[in-house]
């Protein structure tokens, strides 16, 4: 009997490649310990960064920088997926990408791409480099309307990316965590009570951008999902329930709905806003600053700052 010879690419396709697109401390310190980044994968990370920036250059989007903190967060999720044999934007604790990043100590806006291959032939560095490149290119080559990964790679407002890589036995997991760094916050409480008013103080890092609105999203506390649930592909998004805060505008100008603005914005780019945790029940609030460069441009999310409310007396 003749044994068919197949390429590594054919083997990856046959073994099942999975990919899917689109989380306390009292200050901005990490809510959990992040793993040490395995530097044996540095060459693979550099190669993926090179691929990403080549693809962005074609679309005239700015090149991204590799972010160490985002890489640590991405690595933690990649390792968890590899060890527990699942592929999901949700973690074992039920947290989504922006929640993981925020409760680790971050607050910038994120987008996550994940990819995976099982039963890979070789764990040698050059073989893994080929596999991770192939997995990434599959995401980049998506076509509308199912092109969420590609849009994450090419989004013009991203500034940085973290790359997490994990190998467990013959399981390979890759996490690309895209970051948008435009805002700096002063320390913010990460644990609060229902109906608390959190003073939010920040500044824009780029003078050619405007603060359009601040949107405060609410969702219930995450529940621990079953592993079988994590093994089913699904996309993630911010929750539907939210309240919008707008900048104060001088009289005689007013908003069409007559509601007053509450965000004080200075000419220096500094801003202040009272963020009300508007529900009586426990949950997670995510504070999103929407920015734009001019009045006619579509606003984009620049922050995803999460605050956890557990009960009346945390």
List where the protein language model places each region.
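C-terminal segment of classical bacterial N-terminal signal peptides
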Residues: 23-29
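Short beta-strand elements
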Residues: 295-314
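A well-ordered secondary-structure block
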Residues: 97-180, 213-220, 246-290
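Extended low-complexity, serine/threonine- and proline-enriched intrinsically disordered segments
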Residues: 208-246
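Eukaryotic low-complexity, intrinsically disordered acidic/proline-rich regions prevalent
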Residues: 206-212, 259, 281-283, 295-300
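N-terminal secretory signal peptides and thylakoid transit peptides that target proteins
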Residues: 1-19
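Short, well-ordered surface patches within globular domains
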Residues: 34-103, 147-151, 155-162, 170
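Short, compositionally biased P/S/T/A/G/V-rich stretches that sit at domain boundaries
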Residues: 168, 177-205, 209
